[in-house]
Amino acid sequence: MAEDNTITAQDALAKLESGELILVDVRRPDEWLSTGVAKGAWLLDMTDENFGAYLNAVLQRNPDHQIAIICRTGNRTGYLQSVLDENGMTGVLDVTEGMAGGPNGTGWIPRGLPIQDAREAYDAMPKDLIAK
């Protein structure tokens, strides 16, 4: 049986706040600006041509942290997680309920979990992970 690499929004928040987890929001920039992002999330647009290299850099430089990915409803991250697994990037957790919620759960924002302006999150990221 396959390993369950999913995590709830509440558990992701707890691990993020304790410093055990890096949360990567893989939505598009217009989505980040529209809704805000999970407080403390790193922003890596999965449609960026360099997304794979950026995500690999996150994994390589943070071997002692769990990495979780989040999108709007969990559909993109579910697909992305399977692609990552097929390419040897295993162990990435999927926040299946996403930011807005959907069939997999209530969602980060509807749960009232902390969010921040996307520009603040972007400014706090390591500069070499920011798309040019």
What kind of region is each of these model predictions?
Residues 1-21, 29-66, 77-132:
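Rhodanese-like catalytic fold shared by cysteine-dependent sulfurtransferases
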Residues 25, 74:
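Conserved G/P- and acidic residue-centered "switch" motifs that form tight phosphate/ATP-binding loops
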Residues 70:
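Short, surface-exposed ligand- or partner-binding patches at beta-edge/loop junctions that are enriched
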